[in-house]
A protein has these predicted regions:
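Aromatic- and carboxylate-lined catalytic core of secreted/periplasmic carbohydrate-active enzymes
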Residues: 4-9, 291-361
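N-terminal substrate-binding region of glycoside hydrolase catalytic domains
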Residues: 2-132, 137-140, 144-161
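Anion (oxyanion) recognition and catalysis
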Residues: 76, 180, 298
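Short, solvent-exposed loop/turn segments at secondary-structure junctions
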Residues: 28, 48, 89-91, 145, ...
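A structural signal for short coil/turn segments at secondary-structure junctions
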Residues: 79, 131, 135, 183, ...
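Active-site cleft segment of glycoside hydrolase catalytic domains centered on the general acid/base Glu
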Residues: 98-227, 233-254, 276-293, 316-318
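Mature extracellular/periplasmic domains of secretome proteins
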Residues: 29-35, 216-218, 296-297
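Structural recognition of the beta-strand scaffold that forms the well-ordered cores
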Residues: 19-25, 38-48, 81-86, 136-140, ...
């Protein structure tokens, strides 16, 4: 009903798989994330960024795997699904080796595509060969639309990708070919577009459809032909407005339909409160954020969501025992399928019904 104070999120029971709950670790590649239950981990920014290509292949065909080995083995041994982000061009391989982006002057050229794309092929194949059977999922690049409209980045900004739609599409195609030649069961997650909004025609939606339709350089395919899963980042607007989340997911689904990839799962590979961040929230406030976010995401069909980050000083909650306990309780609630329906009020509060009554958060 127009102007209704209540928006139905789901009229059916809400249930998720164990893989729905995911996490990042920032500082310790060997951190098993004790105290919280989860099934999916993402490797972006592991050990303060040591999972980026530039720190793994430090010069042409010279490799350092210490931190990545620790991360992979720790979480594989814990029985978790691993999502590894292929990203971060070394200066020596960069198409624009003096370019400065999100990681500052100490990491020149990182945001550019490789000058010689066969170096990218070799990197992807090397990772897939070393971790075959352990890493199942590969995400290609990180937030390519940050200060980039698909033609070029805005100079002087903290962009993560400085290439074009076509270059990004080629990167995805070549990663798919290199990885699946080694491990045909591996899955490719699309570059995760960020800055979604709950309105039509916004920049994230336009970027997503543009990149999915971009030619890959082989004369016949576009990016959508080379991805298996859609990745997005569902950071909320100022005030961590969970009231906007359902509308954001609706726009993701509209963009997927326009791109011809509606049948693919959607993974929120990175999200957290940022305006303000977790360190500025009380336990009660962070608890409300997590409950509203997770239940809404589950109700709207997000297959996995990965909190950023467990042990970050401003975004994490490693030392907050109450939040860890609430995370685990929320996980059990969603795994049980006991939420029979869910709605949201205009002010962002969540209402969900179980067999024992109604809860407002």
């Amino acid at each position: 009903m127009p102007n209704s104070p209540v928006t139905v999120l789901s009229e059916n029971p809400i249930s998720v798989a164990p893989e729905f709950f995911g996490m990042h670790a920032n500082r310790r590649a060997f951190d098993r994330l004790p105290g919280i239950m989860l099934k999916t981990v993402r490797g972006h920014d592991l050990q303060n960024g040591k999972g980026r290509w530039r720190f793994i292949e430090t010069s042409d065909n010279t490799w350092t795997f210490t931190d990545l080995d620790a991360w992979v083995n720790t979480h594989y041994d814990a029985g978790r699904d691993l999502l590894f982000t292929l990203y971060g061009t070394p200066t020596w391989a960069s198409a624009r080796p003096t370019e400065i982006g999100a990681y500052g002057p100490g990491n020149p050229g990182t945001q550019a595509e490789p000058a010689d794309m066969t170096k990218w092929d070799r990197f992807c194949a090397k990772i897939a060969s070393r971790y075959r059977g352990k890493i199942k999922y590969y995400e290609v690049w990180n937030e390519p639309n940050m200060y980039n409209d698909g033609t070029a980045p805005i100079p002087g900004t903290t962009f993560f990708f400085s290439g074009t739609f076509a270059k990004l599409a080629e990167i995805v195609r070549r990663a798919n070919i290199a990885i699946k030649a080694v491990d045909p069961t591996a899955k490719i997650v699309s570059p995760a577009v960020t800055n979604w909004a709950a309105k039509a025609g916004q920049s994230a939606e336009n970027y997503f459809t543009g990149m999915m339709a971009a030619p890959t350089g082989d004369g016949s395919t576009t990016m959508k032909d080379w991805v298996d899963i859609v990745g997005v980042h569902l950071y909320l607007s100022s005030g961590n407005s969970t009231a906007d989340l359902a509308g954001m997911i609706d726009r993701v689904n509209a963009a997927k339909a326009a791109a011809g990839v509606s049948s693919m799962e959607t993974w929120d590979t990175e999200s957290a409160p940022i305006a303000p961040n977790a360190s500025a929230l009380s336990d009660d406030q962070l608890d409300r954020y997590l409950t509203r976010f997770m239940v809404t995401a589950a109700a709207k069909g997000i297959a996995r969501t990965m909190y950023y980050q467990w042990d970050n000083d401003v975004m994490g909650f490693r030392e907050r025992i109450n939040i860890g306990g609430r995370w685990n309780a929320l996980r059990e609630l969603l795994l049980s399928g006991s939420i029979l329906s869910a709605s949201k009020l205009f002010d962002g509060r969540l209402i969900y019904r179980t067999s024992t009554g109604t809860t407002i958060v």
